[in-house]
């Protein structure tokens, strides 16, 4: 790095200078959403908002001591029987804002197929299903999660149990509506669309239209979204009746207790700086965001070869493996989740200490959703964005939209350089292993599966190198280990 330090220093100075110019040129324009109640209302407890005692008890069991801002804003309207459209910053407690009124109504009028929740991703569907089950554990709730990548026959059996709540992705739900004998939603009382902007961005309009045609017009509808796009506005007009509008965020808002930094690095040492950052924060849970599925796998394999407890999560993994990686990270059996933007929205992983943008997000809103995986529910967190000489323009655009300059993350260059040789060796070995995996797939040969990586053997089995001498996470790889009122149908 010494032979290029001069040019790297010049690049850094240009970068810092351009940041200042760019931020003076442009003021962020945030999207203000109309509120029904403009005056500030004193914080109330769940009981004071009208939540019934069984559900207040359930909230307490889950550690929800007081309503979040979106819950404070949405629950009074929802409990009065109104349709609701809510915009809230990530990690704001949206699930509780729609689950509580649904369950309260279900207690008074128990029936099967009471509520349908539509989500854009499988992982979010499972998470919402788990939260419904946790809230309804004391009242005999039955919930079913219906998503792609899972056997249709097994799902048909789950629907035959006549669950109270169905949480589904639009495509698979339409498959069952069209093909599963005896299944219909003619008696549905609630429709909830969570992450509605993302549902529409993923081209589910055709499926949504089919679903809206076969459910009752006389229903209550809640629509929750991170942003108010033209498509969301159109969907609101088509599916909601005189909704109460609540908002606790703007388009590019991040939570106050999130410390945001950038680190400017030469592209050829990008992996080394990532290893340095993870070592600096050893013992903390971290999500590392990558741009592609291939990069995600390669970085995860590289980190495991260096002895770090990393698991991948991306769209090309089977549903079983995706849930396996997610559950290991959520249970703290693994410290590092390396993923694409599949994990950037909606997933509730409360213990994330740090987010690293290894690859630059393509849009400002993607940046907000990524860093929103940490500093959730009142906790503090740190987000560090890796900026190379090729990312400067995209990064300056993000800063301008945020309306603030991020602090530079200070590092000791000599300590980074100590890691170069081993990191480069691990990176090369990861490439070799990835190439072998591709060749095995093409040839159709079977190989022993690893719990974390799907089609790789125990990561780094041939090349694994501990990094205890680096003073960081280290170890031999591997896992940490060790570590009422009832309703009828």
UniProtKB/Swiss-Prot annotation:
Keywords tagged on the record: ATP-binding, Helicase, Hydrolase, Nucleotide-binding, Nucleus, Ribosome biogenesis, RNA-binding, rRNA processing
One GO CC term, this protein: P granule
Biological process according to GO: rRNA processing
UniProt motif (Q motif) ranges: 44-72
Chief location bin: nucleus
EC number: 3.6.4.13
Bias (Gly residues): 469-480
Reactions accelerated catalytically: ATP + H2O = ADP + phosphate + H(+)
Gene Ontology molecular function: ATP binding; ATP hydrolysis activity; RNA binding; RNA helicase activity
Region of interest called Disordered, as start-end residue ranges on this chain: 433-489
Domain Helicase C-terminal as annotated: residue spans: 257-417
Residue ranges of every copy of the Helicase ATP-binding domain listed in the record: 75-246
Binding site for ATP: 88-95
Family: Belongs to the DEAD box helicase family. DDX47/RRP3 subfamily.
Function: Probable ATP-dependent RNA helicase which may be involved in ribosome biogenesis.
Protein name: Putative ATP-dependent RNA helicase T26G10.1
Species: Caenorhabditis elegans
């Amino acid at each position: 790095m010494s032979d290029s330090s001069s040019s790297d220093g010049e690049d850094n100075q240009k970068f810092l200078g351009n940041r200042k110019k760019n931020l003076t040129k442009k003021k962020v324009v945030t999207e203000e959403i109309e509120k029904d109640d403009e005056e500030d209302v004193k914080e109330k407890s769940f009981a004071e908002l009208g939540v019934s005692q069984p559900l207040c008890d359930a909230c307490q069991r889950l550690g929800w001591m007081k309503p979040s801002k979106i819950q404070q804003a949405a629950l009074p309207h929802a409990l009065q029987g109104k349709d609701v459209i809510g915009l809230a910053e990530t990690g704001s407690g949206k699930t509780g804002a729609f689950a509580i009124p649904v369950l309260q109504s279900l207690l008074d009028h128990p029936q099967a197929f009471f509520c349908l929740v539509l989500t854009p991703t499988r992982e979010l569907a499972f998470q919402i299903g788990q939260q419904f089950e946790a809230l309804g554990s004391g009242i005999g709730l039955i919930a079913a999660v219906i998503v792609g990548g899972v056997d249709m026959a097994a799902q048909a059996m789950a629907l035959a149990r006549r669950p109270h709540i169905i949480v589904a992705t639009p495509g698979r739900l339409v498959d069952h509506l069209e093909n599963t004998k005896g299944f219909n939603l003619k008696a549905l009382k609630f429709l909830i669309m969570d992450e509605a902007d993302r549902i529409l961005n993923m081209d589910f309009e055709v499926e949504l239209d089919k679903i809206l045609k076969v459910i009752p017009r006389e229903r209550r509808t809640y629509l929750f979204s991170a942003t108010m796009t033209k498509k969301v506005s159109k969907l609101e007009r088509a599916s909601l009746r005189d909704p109460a509008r609540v908002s606790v965020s703007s388009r590019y808002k991040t939570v106050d207790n999130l410390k945001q930094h950038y680190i400017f690095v030469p592209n050829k040492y990008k992996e080394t700086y990532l290893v340095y950052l993870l070592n600096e924060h050893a013992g903390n849970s971290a999500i590392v965001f990558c741009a592609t599925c291939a990069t995600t796998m390669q970085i995860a394999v590289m980190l495991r070869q260096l002895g770090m407890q990393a698991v991948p999560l991306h769209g090309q993994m089977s549903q079983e493996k995706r849930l396996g990686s997610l559950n290991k990270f959520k249970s703290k059996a693994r410290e590092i989740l390396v993923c694409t933007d599949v994990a950037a929205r909606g997933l509730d992983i409360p213990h994330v200490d740090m987010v690293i943008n290894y690859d630059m997000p393509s849009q400002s809103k993607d940046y907000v959703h990524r860093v929103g995986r940490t500093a959730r529910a009142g906790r503090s967190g740190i987000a560090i964005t890796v900026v190379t000489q090729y990312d400067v323009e995209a990064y300056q655009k993000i800063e301008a939209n945020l309306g603030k300059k991020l602090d530079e993350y200070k590092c000791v260059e000599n300590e980074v350089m100590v890691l170069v040789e081993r990191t480069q060796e691990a990176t090369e070995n990861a490439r070799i292993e990835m190439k072998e995996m591709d060749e095995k797939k093409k040839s159709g040969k079977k190989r022993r599966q690893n719990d974390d990586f799907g089609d790789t053997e125990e990561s780094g089995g041939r090349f694994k190198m501990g990094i205890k001498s680096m003073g960081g996470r280290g170890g031999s790889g591997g896992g940490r280990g060790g570590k009422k009122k009832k309703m009828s149908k």
